[in-house]
């Protein structure tokens, strides 16, 4: 005797469920494979459920400072329909595309834009539109300084994590970053995590941050060679603080037996931790001649080396 069972077809899943599933697929497949399966999947891909979190950091590394990157963002971000919560991208070309992001940042909580060509004026002009941010990464953005940081701190009152790491070569000619340290201390009192690796910051600058950011739980000072903090004083004053950086030993336990596993990273006889697309149009319905305005698969073949293994969709139950 056959049991009566109800099966739900893949194309009948609710859009938010489809969006959650598709968000775990590689970007290329979401844009070139999924829309061709059926109309329901194509609608899900062009709707907001797939794009509440946009992580194209790896993809953007291939098109650093490129108009391809601008076009990708201009296509994907509006699909979120104002529900964008997280954006990870590297190498924004200029303030214009950053302003475009800010225009759609009403729900944005996490923003990662390292290695971008942003300027002080560009950040100042849009900082108030980023007020919902809790996490911001402006690492390796060499054209901004204390003015931009102060604007972020002034308008982003919910900011809890701030990354402002630099590359040693980018700061070789910089005399001091204390002005940035003071901007952070004076405008970001609720920070819980701060990364300022390889900043030319002084001991006074770091102490100013520590005295003002009383909720700080993690501080990265890797490569901040001018900072000298007394180990005993630090243990007594900030017993729960985790610090990664020179002249502060024993506050960062990433794994068990860290020193044994990574002894090569410690300088002998010192207190340092020494470590060093697409098409012009928007994807439309993939049916008959309507696909002539769709995604151009050759964009990937001509411009990047990507994993092109065939994707086999499971049959509908």
Curated annotation (Swiss-Prot):
Record's keyword terms, sorted: Nucleus, Ubl conjugation pathway
GO biological process: negative regulation of gene expression; post-transcriptional regulation of gene expression; protein ubiquitination; response to abscisic acid; ubiquitin-dependent protein catabolic process
Keyword Acetylation: no
Gene3D superfamilies linked to this entry: 1.20.1280.50, Ribonuclease Inhibitor (3.80.10.10)
Subcellular localization, as worded in the UniProt entry: Nucleus
Recorded metabolic or biological pathway in which this protein acts: Protein modification; protein ubiquitination
Top-level taxonomic group: Eukaryota
Any Pfam family hit: LRR_6
Gene Ontology CC terms, in alphabetical order: nucleus
Keyword Aminoacyl-tRNA synthetase: no
Chain ranges of the F-box domain: 7-54
Predominant location category: nucleus
Signal peptide (residue range): none
Function: Component of SCF(ASK-cullin-F-box) E3 ubiquitin ligase complexes, which may mediate the ubiquitination and subsequent proteasomal degradation of target proteins.
Entry comment, domain topic: The F-box is necessary for the interaction with ASK proteins.
Alphabetical list of PANTHER family matching this protein: F-BOX DOMAIN CONTAINING PROTEIN, EXPRESSED, F-BOX DOMAIN, LEUCINE-RICH REPEAT DOMAIN SUPERFAMILY
Assembly description: Part of a SCF (SKP1-cullin-F-box) protein ligase complex. Interacts with CUL1, CUL2 and SPK1B/ASK2.
Name by which UniProt lists this protein: F-box protein FBW2
Species this protein is from: Arabidopsis thaliana (Mouse-ear cress)
């Amino acid at each position: 005797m056959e049991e009566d069972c109800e099966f739900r077809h893949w194309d009948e899943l609710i859009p938010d469920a489809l969006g959650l599933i598709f968000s775990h697929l590689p970007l290329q497949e979401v844009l070139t494979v999924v829309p061709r399966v059926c109309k329901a999947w194509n609608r899900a891909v062009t709707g907001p459920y797939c794009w509440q979190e946009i992580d194209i950091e790896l993809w953007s590394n291939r098109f650093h400072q490129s108009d391809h990157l601008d076009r990708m963002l201009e296509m994907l971000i509006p699909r979120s329909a104002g529900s964008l919560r997280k954006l990870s991208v590297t190498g924004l070309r200029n303030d214009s595309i950053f302003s475009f992001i800010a225009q759609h940042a009403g729900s944005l909580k996490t923003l990662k834009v390292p290695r971008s060509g942003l300027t002080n004026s560009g950040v100042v002009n849009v900082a108030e539109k980023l007020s919902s941010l809790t996490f911001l990464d402006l690492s390796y953005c060499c054209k901004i300084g204390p003015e931009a940081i102060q604007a972020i701190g002034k308008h982003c009152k919910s900011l809890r994590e701030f990354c402002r790491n630099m590359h040693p070569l980018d700061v070789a000619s910089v005399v001091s970053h204390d002005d940035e340290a003071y901007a952070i201390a004076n405008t970001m009192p609720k920070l819980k995590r701060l990364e300022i690796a390889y900043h030319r910051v002084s001991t006074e600058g770091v102490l100013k941050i520590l005295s003002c950011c009383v909720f700080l739980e993690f501080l990265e000072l890797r490569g901040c060679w001018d900072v000298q903090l007394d180990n005993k004083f630090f243990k007594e004053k900030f017993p729960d603080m985790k610090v990664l950086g020179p002249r502060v030993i024993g506050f960062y336990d990433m794994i068990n037996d860290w020193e044994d596993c990574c002894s090569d990273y410690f300088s002998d006889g010192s207190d340092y931790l020494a470590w060093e697309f697409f098409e012009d149009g928007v994807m439309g319905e993939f049916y008959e001649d309507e696909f002539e305005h769709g995604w151009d698969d050759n964009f990937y073949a001509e411009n990047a080396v990507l994993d092109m293994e065939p994707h086999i969709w499971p049959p509908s139950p």
